[in-house]
Amino acid sequence: MEHKRESNLELLRILMILSIIGHHFVVNSGLPQLFSFDNITFNMVFLQVFGMWGKTAINVFTLITGYFMVKSDLTLKKFLKLYLPIKFWSFLFTFIFAITGYTIFSFKDIWKIIFSMIYEADVYYAGTLIVMMLLIPFMNVLARALSKRQYQLMLAVLLIYFTFLSTFMMRDTFDFTGWLCTVYLIGGYIRLYPLKVDNLKC
């Protein structure tokens, strides 16, 4: 069965990819360390704005994943389609950096790549994403079983815990894995209970 391509989501994906590239360019270039807030320049402001959307892009990608995956099942093929490219590029760049002298080769780095779920989960996106993917079958069962009201209450509790308490109560409640699962469930809610705009008038 063919799936209808949604051009608006494709465009959004492209914009988010560019946002992630911009974020890594600014953050990993070392330029932020040269910024002086005593002498704010146009270049400084431009780079700050240009590189500020990396986390937003991660949230958007997770939201889209929840939107499309909540009604489907995570198969081994789908999981490996995500997992294997991550490992391939991780190994490739590790060897390239070692060969070019950018980094020193270490078997510890290889070990960390193999067991990234242990070393990177809740720290780096790739490791956390793999953990979230493994939780998708369970989140889907939960999302489909809850009533609309129960689903809303669950999201309210999660959002209060991860955002309100840390923002207004100064509590360190944020957790990267938990947050990605929350955003996934928000995407699933949007898919299961879409906003009907047919009768809305401007």
Model regions and ranges:
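Aromatic-anchored, glycine/proline-accented short structural segments
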Residues: T173-C202
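Membrane-cytosol interface segments of multi-pass membrane proteins
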Residues: M1-I160, N199-L200
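Membrane-interface helix caps and helix-loop-helix hairpins in membrane proteins
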Residues: F115-E120, F164-D175
